[in-house]
């Protein structure tokens, strides 16, 4: 079986000279290698084709046969690496926390410790008859987050 570590290392070597970065490598039964890459701007089909050719040059089909899929991380795919969070600062995201609660808000910041999201909440001030909307910044560590993904809104 082809090792994920070997494939990841080859990809990192190839992408080191570009603005693309590795999001994930999955090796499925039957040696199906699925590679996801991303970019702070956009990943082109040429980027995917170039990486695919590079991997085919460096992995020997005579030793072990495999099937290869190289693609970009989809816009609705959950974020898997910190750089995807940083790329989406200022965008609206949907988060599912491990405690089961789901929230939407604007991603304010992200670093190796976690993320800060601005969330709108309805709060009833003391003595008021109606609830008012307030925006609060909430911090979460990556251990608390099950997934985060870009929120697409059609208006």
Swiss-Prot record:
Entry's localization field: Cytoplasm
SUPFAM superfamilies from the UniProt entry: YhbC-like, N-terminal domain (SSF75420)
Record InterPro entries: Ribosome_maturation_RimP, RimP_C, RimP_N, RimP_N_sf
Keywords: Cytoplasm, Ribosome biogenesis
Entry-linked HAMAP family: RimP
Disulfide bonds: none
Main location class: cytoplasm
Domain of life (superkingdom): Bacteria
GO biological process per UniProt: ribosomal small subunit assembly; translation
Family: Belongs to the RimP family.
Any one annotated GO CC term: cytosol
Function: Required for maturation of 30S ribosomal subunits.
Pfam families: DUF150_C, RimP_N
Protein name (Swiss-Prot/TrEMBL): Ribosome maturation factor RimP
